[in-house]
């Protein structure tokens, strides 16, 4: 049997796996246990009451977190003409069409998000086998295929997160860094859950948001008591 590290022993002692923690307590616990030598991300797992086997119950989209993600995001944009200039002015690191596609084919992908205008999809479509497995393929549902590429670039830079349920109906994404304030992390979490509720498939029955857990990069998951979150959808 593998020997537990000091860090793992501390986590086991501090975190009650069967308890739903009030949000303030959950965040304080994460911060206390974040002892890595780098600034850890704060991630969230949201268990949704959907049947992930059915395409009409899958949840996918994007939302801009009010306090960003704490990450520097590099954006590549496939577009041309006036849109190309607008994308550059909005802060895109790479802008092009066939020339940008050639870089991707060579494996030169120094970017985190790909945006495309509709007229560029004839070029981007040829890159599906490269971009798809990396989660970089532009999609209208996440706002990355759009005539307004400048806005998409600004959203990506401002802290937009994309979400998509896995085969078990769970959404995994980030809500910031462990050096964010407790208030910033709570606001980001609440904003994400509101976005997920707005994206609820009409075919989903029963309890929709079943469980919410937060964790740091190197830490254990801490279940959050949803009653301590403000996530009412108007």
From Swiss-Prot:
Pfam families: Ribosomal_L1
Any GO CC annotation of this UniProt entry: cytosolic large ribosomal subunit
Gene3D superfamilies: 3.30.190.20, 3.40.50.790
Biological process terms in GO annotation: regulation of translation; translation
Database matches in CDD domains: Ribosomal_L1 (cd00403)
InterPro entries per UniProt: Ribosom_uL1_bac-type (IPR005878), Ribosomal_uL1 (IPR002143), Ribosomal_uL1-like (IPR023674), Ribosomal_uL1/biogenesis (IPR028364), Ribosomal_uL1_3-a/b-sand (IPR016095), Ribosomal_uL1_CS (IPR023673)
Ribosomal protein found in the keyword field: yes
Function text: Binds directly to 23S rRNA. The L1 stalk is quite mobile in the ribosome, and is involved in E site tRNA release.
Self-association state and partner proteins as the record states: Part of the 50S ribosomal subunit.
Entry protein name: Large ribosomal subunit protein uL1
Gene expressing this chain: rplA
């Amino acid at each position: 049997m593998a020997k537990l590290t000091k860090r793992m022993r501390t986590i086991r002692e501090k975190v009650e796996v069967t308890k739903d923690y009030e949000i303030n307590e959950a965040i304080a616990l994460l911060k206390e246990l974040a002892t890595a030598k780098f600034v850890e991300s704060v991630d969230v797992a949201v268990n949704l009451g959907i049947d992930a086997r059915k395409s009409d119950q899958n949840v996918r989209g994007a939302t801009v977190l009010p306090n960003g993600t704490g990450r520097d995001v590099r954006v590549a944009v496939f577009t041309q003409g006036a849109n190309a200039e607008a994308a550059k002015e909005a802060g895109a690191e790479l802008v092009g069409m066939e020339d940008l596609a050639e870089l991707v084919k060579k494996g030169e992908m120094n970017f985190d998000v790909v945006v495309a205008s509709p007229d560029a999809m004839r070029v981007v479509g040829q890159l599906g086998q490269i971009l798809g497995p990396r989660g970089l393929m532009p999609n209208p549902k996440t706002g990355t295929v759009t005539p307004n590429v400048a806005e998409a670039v600004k959203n990506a830079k401002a802290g937009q997160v994309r979400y998509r349920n896995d085969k078990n109906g769970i959404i995994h994404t980030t809500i910031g860094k462990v050096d964010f304030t407790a208030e910033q992390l709570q606001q980001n979490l609440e904003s994400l859950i509101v976005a997920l509720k707005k994206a609820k498939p009409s075919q989903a029955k029963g309890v929709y948001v079943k469980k919410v857990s937060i964790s740091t990069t190197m830490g254990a998951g801490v279940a959050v008591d949803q009653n301590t979150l403000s996530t009412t959808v108007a």
